[in-house]
């Protein structure tokens, strides 16, 4: 069994073909393209090299795992607002889409099953976070559980400019 793994970030995109045992069979990376068409063309070139049993994607933003839509905002604005499940349906593969910081939290749970409560902070092109509560990943009602990226640091804001500059990101 070989899984296609993709990590979309604000600076770079990474791809790896991984065995069920976690062995990396192939890997590639590129600077994050300027648009969705370029990203999809590169992804297609990666996926066309072998037979895969599924696609696992790590992405910034608020991931609705039922619809495959990435909400919120990130350093890669063109990945938001449409269903990735629909976009990648032509491959005929199961797709697992998850927030990048949540992937860190899930990895910590896998490595440390005794973990009860933890906070994970991801610092890259943007800032993200995940929370482990009672031994489980906390996703939150609106898929933003643990997200620290746009946290108000000062209140009250009298203008939109003050509100934006009081947010914790960039």
Name each region found by the language model.
Residues 3-59, 66:
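Conserved phosphate-binding loops in N-terminal lobes of ATP-dependent enzymes
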Residues 13, 64, 106, 128, ...:
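Conserved protein kinase catalytic core
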Residues 16-19, 36, 96-98, 111-170:
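Glycine/GP-enriched mid-protein hinge/lid loop-to-helix segment characteristic of carbohydrate kinases
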Residues 33-44, 54-55, 63-117, 153-162:
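Glycine-rich phosphate-binding loop and adjoining helix at the ATP-binding site
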Residues 27-30, 74, 141:
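Short hydrophobic alpha-helix segments
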Residues 24, 70, 137-138:
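Hydrophobic "anchor" residues
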